[in-house]
Amino acid sequence: MTKLGISVGILATILCLPVGAQTIKVMALDQSGAQTILQAAKNSAQQRNAPSAIAVVDPAGDLLAFQRMDGVRPASADLAIGKARTAARLQRSTAEIEDNINQGRMAFVTADIMALRGGMPIR
């Protein structure tokens, strides 16, 4: 038998073995939870007299809830969604990412990363 034949036989045996997959429990954010977070952020903005654009996303960065309060510039909508998406996907605040860039970590200067303060991961 050739080395190739032995290798194929070993590979076939390995592929037929049962796999013990490890699983993790992931908490899903539903619409009710997203609205609760949105309202809490809105209340905080009102207390600080700082109208805001507020976005809540799931762990993949997909939008679940959004509100642009009166007096907020239209461009803030895209910024808020980008900050939320970045914080969710990287599981760190966008302030931390902005600080990393300011310290020279240019790897964070890529498409689809919004490195402006204001995004917080939901934990």
Where on the chain are the PLM-derived regions?
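N-terminal secretory signal peptides that target proteins for export/translocation
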Residues: 1-2
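Flexible, solvent-exposed loop/hinge segments and secondary-structure transition points
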Residues: 21-123
